[in-house]
Design a protein with these regions (language model features):
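Context-dependent free N-terminus signature
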Residues: 2-3, 40
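Alpha/beta-hydrolase superfamily serine-hydrolase fold, recognizing
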Residues: 32-369
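Cleavable N-terminal signal peptides of Sec/SRP-targeted secreted and luminal proteins
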Residues: 10-17
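Cationic, low-complexity basic patches in intrinsically disordered or flexible, solvent-exposed regions
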Residues: 20, 26
């Protein structure tokens, strides 16, 4: 059995810090940089665009193998239940062999009395601006494992295709494939509560996956959007203030979109600008979405765009629980142990409240550990 979740920080890109999950020592926040519009975003992101259009990702986080025999997860939760330790098993399952996509499935052991087949299922999409990281990348493997242990739930982390090798809508197409996979997986245990969740750009993928689920007739209990990554041609106040942002400086943010969007598309494309995206989605279709938990932070550059999405969902009649005033910056849960614990507790609380009777059963089982 693997003792999981070691520290990694191999790039200037601050997404790579993941020690927050189990290390009692606080992961240091990235130092403030004096950046300008003339900064080299390729150097900042530690990437190189090759002549054939592929990308060399020179600062990638370590890729972790799955742990079918289990890894020991020690979680310090912000909830009243206090610390918990669980073994979480993980396996890679094919999604589409032709596309090279897969799902890494995390399942916690020892929850309740043989009820693992009825645990809530969370379909999870990782962050990285559509360009960086995999489901196996250490920070996001760790995030999924801790969520599986903390909620507790089965967490299916989607290894979707990355840009620029596979520009949008490739990741959205992979999300639709993942929804079809969930329908098949959930069919084996009728009544299993299903949730869709994404962090950062993964939140934008999760939103489209939830629409696909509604179109496919898959019942969802909830949708969790953590700091959704959006932009647009005309700068918002938050974006104008983010030129020297410690995590997502404006030039690096612009480059991520340039690499992710279809050729010749600008940031007002529907894949990027929430106003353009929402213009193409009817209120009747939005109304089919399940209850939503939307998380944001006061210093997150896309926060103004996130509020646009929240307003549109509420106007359509969607049950939205918006917590947009969290302290700190983009992806802060990857740096501060207390923020990680708070984030995990928020997700766990939302899942328990919307999972129905089974959510109460799981909560009681966790309290006995």
């Amino acid at each position: 059995m693997r003792r999981a979740l070691s520290y990694v920080c191999s790039s200037s890109v601050v997404f790579l810090a993941s020690e927050y999950i189990t290390n009692p020592q606080q992961t240091p926040c990235p130092a403030r940089r004096k950046l300008s519009e003339t900064m080299d975003p390729y150097k900042y992101l530690n990437i190189r665009l090759n002549p054939d259009g592929s990308l060399s990702r020179n600062g990638e986080a370590k890729l972790l193998p799955p742990a079918p025999s289990g890894e020991l997860i020690a979680v310090t939760s912000a909830s009243a239940d206090g610390p918990a330790r669980r073994i979480v098993h993980s396996n890679d399952l094919p999604l589409d062999d032709a596309k090279g996509t897969s799902v890494r499935l995390f399942v916690p052991a020892g929850v309740g009395d043989g009820a693992s087949s009825r645990l809530p299922l969370i379909l999870y999409f990782h962050g990285g601006g559509y360009v960086l990281f995999r489901a196996a990348s250490e920070p996001f493997h760790n995030t999924a494992a801790v969520l599986a242990a903390t909620v507790p739930a089965a967490v299916a982390s989607v290894d979707y295709r990355l840009a620029p090798e596979h520009r949008l809508p490739a990741a959205f197409d992979d999300a639709a494939d993942a929804v079809r996979w969930v329908r098949s997986y959930a069919a084996g245990s009728p009544g299993r509560p299903v949730f869709i969740m994404g962090c950062h750009n993964g939140a934008s993928i999760a939103f489209r996956a939830a629409l696909a689920a509604a179109d496919q007739g898959l019942e969802l209990r909830g949708l969790i959007l953590n700091q959704a990554h959006h932009s647009g041609v005309e700068r918002t106040a938050a974006e104008n203030a983010s030129v020297d942002d410690r995590v997502l400086p404006l030039p690096a943010n612009d480059l991520l979109w340039e690499l992710a969007l279809p050729f010749a598309a600008d940031r007002d494309h529907e894949y990027c600008n929430p106003e353009t995206m929402l213009a193409g989605v009817s209120k009747a279709r939005l109304r089919k979405l399940p209850p939503c938990l939307v998380l944001g932070r006061k210093k997150d550059p896309p926060r103004d765009r996130q509020r646009v999405l929240v307003a549109a969902l509420r106007e359509a009649g969607v049950d939205v629980e918006a917590r947009m005033d969290g302290a700190g910056f983009h992806a802060m849960e990857l740096f501060k142990p207390n923020c990680a614990a708070e984030f995990n507790a928020q997700v766990a609380d939302f899942v328990r409240r919307h999972a129905g009777d089974h959510g109460v059963e799981v909560h009681a089982a966790r309290s006995r550990l």
